[in-house]
């Protein structure tokens, strides 16, 4: 079985010009806010667009040309702040700056609300990203966390305990450690009976396989985590055999239910409910230009984070455009910035 995480890219990637299918919400993803009249000031200055805020990412797309779009996963975000930017539609105005890192490349995004006086651009994105950051226990494998209090599992907001199994040996050491299993709707938690701080929390999101395998301690429950977390193999000994089989059956069943509709743990309620994402995304009309999928261009370089830039570069006259523009960085051409990434 493949883990949900191995197929999940929405919160863990920055992508440009995604397909209409990729703009749709995946299972467990929910649209939280929709903001019209938002300008992508860095990459598409002067182009009015729409910003969609989900529990996993933000999506911006041009209203005039929906295939011009971008998707920014919250896990890629390094910093969010507000600064003054120069917008073609608003002039000098306060904008949302988002610094990200994806595949060892830093991208910077600047979003400006074309409609003056509305703080929702800032409040929605910042608040939802904070909710994502504070709910990592739903999504990340955690060792030695503050999981247990008075021998009881400290429940997450959307969590329910389905089973508690005593007498479970953790096989991570030569002699093993006796402890207790908690099986919930979002994760499996084990802690040592003699030391509650010796524990592990394994979200279903991270689980690649659950099976019974032979070990030096005899048959054991073996959990393999996703490749993105390093592919950990965790072994647990449960006696008698029928108790072990029941535990594996129960965990596999709950993992299957979770995989069909994951709980990512990001909770944020808007006063006004947005329309479903399918109704908001504009169907991309076919055009008569064929784009070769294997042909890569550098259109996304407009979003590269320019860490040394403190001020706008001096204006220079562009013969190609017939007007003054900010001087391009070395190695960049107007032609390269106009090309659409395939």
From Swiss-Prot:
Entry-linked Pfam families: BBL5 (PF07289)
GO cellular component terms, semicolon-separated: BBSome; centriolar satellite; ciliary basal body; ciliary membrane; cytoplasm
Record bears the keyword Cytoplasm: yes
Domain of life: Eukaryota
GO term, biological process aspect, one: gastrulation
SMART domains found in the cross-reference section: DM16
Compartment annotation: Cell projection, Cilium membrane; Cytoplasm, Cytoskeleton, Microtubule organizing center, Centrosome, Centriolar satellite
GO MF, any single term: phosphatidylinositol-3-phosphate binding
Transmembrane keyword on record: no
Keywords: Cell membrane, Cell projection, Cilium, Cytoplasm, Cytoskeleton, Membrane
Main location: membrane
Quaternary data: Part of BBSome complex.
Family: Belongs to the BBS5 family.
Function: Required for ciliogenesis.
PANTHER family reported for this sequence: BARDET-BIEDL SYNDROME 5 PROTEIN, BARDET-BIEDL SYNDROME PROTEIN 5
The protein's name in its UniProt record: BBSome complex member BBS5
Annotated source species: Danio rerio
Gene expressing this chain: bbs5
């Amino acid at each position: 079985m493949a883990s949900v995480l191995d197929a999940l890219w929405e919160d863990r990637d920055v992508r440009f010009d995604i397909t209409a299918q990729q703009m749709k919400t995946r299972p467990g993803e929910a649209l939280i806010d929709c903001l019209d009249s938002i300008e992508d000031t860095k990459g598409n200055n002067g182009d009015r667009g729409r910003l969609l805020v989900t529990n996993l990412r933000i999506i911006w797309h041009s209203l005039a040309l929906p295939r011009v779009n971008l998707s920014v996963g919250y896990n890629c975000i390094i910093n969010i702040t507000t600064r003054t930017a120069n917008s073609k539609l608003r002039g000098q105005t306060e904008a949302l700056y988002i610094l990200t890192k994806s595949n060892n490349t830093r991208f910077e995004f600047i979003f400006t609300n074309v409609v003056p006086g509305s703080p929702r651009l800032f409040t929605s994105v910042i608040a939802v990203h904070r909710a994502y950051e504070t709910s990592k226990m739903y999504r990340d494998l955690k060792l030695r966390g503050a999981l247990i209090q008075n021998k009881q599992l400290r429940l997450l907001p959307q969590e329910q305990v389905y089973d508690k199994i005593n007498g479970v040996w953790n096989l991570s050491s030569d002699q093993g450690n006796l402890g207790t299993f908690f099986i919930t709707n979002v994760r499996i938690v084990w802690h040592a009976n003699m030391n509650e701080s010796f524990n592990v929390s394994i979200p279903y999101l991270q689980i690649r396989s659950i099976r019974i395998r032979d070990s030096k301690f005899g048959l054991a429950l073996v959990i393999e985590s996703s490749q993105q977390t390093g592919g950990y193999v965790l072994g647990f000994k449960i006696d008698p055999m029928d108790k072990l089989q029941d535990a594996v059956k129960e965990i596999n069943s709950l993992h299957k239910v979770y995989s069909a509709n994951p709980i990512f743990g990001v909770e944020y309620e808007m006063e006004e409910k947005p329309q479903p994402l399918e109704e908001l995304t504009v169907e991309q009309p076919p055009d008569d230009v064929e784009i070769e999928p294997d042909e890569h261009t550098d259109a996304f370089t407009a979003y590269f984070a320019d860490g040394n830039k403190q001020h706008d570069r001096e204006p220079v006259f562009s013969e190609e455009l017939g007007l003054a523009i900010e001087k391009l960085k070395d190695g960049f051409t107007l032609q390269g910035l106009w090309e659409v990434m395939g």
